[in-house]
UniProtKB/Swiss-Prot annotation:
The gene is SMS-2. Signal peptide: none annotated. Its cofactor is Mn(2+); Mg(2+); Co(2+); K(+). Pfam families: S-AdoMet_synt_C. This is S-adenosylmethionine synthase 2. Binds 2 divalent ions per subunit. The metal ions interact primarily with the substrate. Can utilize magnesium, manganese or cobalt (in vitro). Binds 1 potassium ion per subunit. The potassium ion interacts primarily with the substrate. Homotetramer. The lineage of its organism: Eukaryota, Viridiplantae, Streptophyta, Embryophyta, Tracheophyta.
Length: 145
């Protein structure tokens, strides 16, 4: 009867994007359900903003107690300017998907868990707010044809 996981789909993309089933709300940023979703959001936004693709999804999978992700996957749905495997390589060179590093690189512990109260209304994505560090686009280096 707890509150964790009550609005999983609304917290993300309202059913438009794929979702692994892990909840964000009620979890601290060390949990990959939350931090993993944030880093793949930043990676996907950066791919599109850099012009590598018009649309994409970035997926990451983890196992408990394993410090590295089991897999990272990119699908540009055929909109990529270069092959998806090359986009994936650029993403892996730019983003650190290790759980501990996500928290550090996105500064997720700043301000304690109180900063996540804002996510209770209007979700976790799509807002320009200094506390939503995962919404900041990182420049990606690639050779434009």
């Amino acid at each position: 009867a707890g509150l964790t996981g009550r609005k999983i789909i609304i917290d993300t993309y309202g059913g438009w994007g794929a979702h692994g089933g892990g909840a964000f709300s009620g979890k601290d940023p060390t949990k990959v359900d939350r931090s993993g979703a944030y880093i793949v959001r930043q990676a996907a936004k950066s791919i599109v903003a850099s012009g590598l693709a018009r649309r994409c999804i970035v997926q990451v999978s983890y196992a408990i107690g394993v410090p590295e992700p089991l897999s990272v996957f990119v699908d540009s749905y055929g909109t990529g300017k270069i092959p998806d495997r090359e986009i994936l390589q650029i993403v892996k060179e730019t983003f650190d998907f290790r759980p501990g590093m996500i928290s550090i690189n996105l500064d997720l512990k700043r301000g304690g868990n109180g900063r996540f109260l804002k996510t209770a209304a209007y979700g976790h994505f799509g807002r320009e707010d200094p506390d939503f560090t995962w919404e900041v686009v990182k420049p990606l280096k690639w050779e434009k044809a």
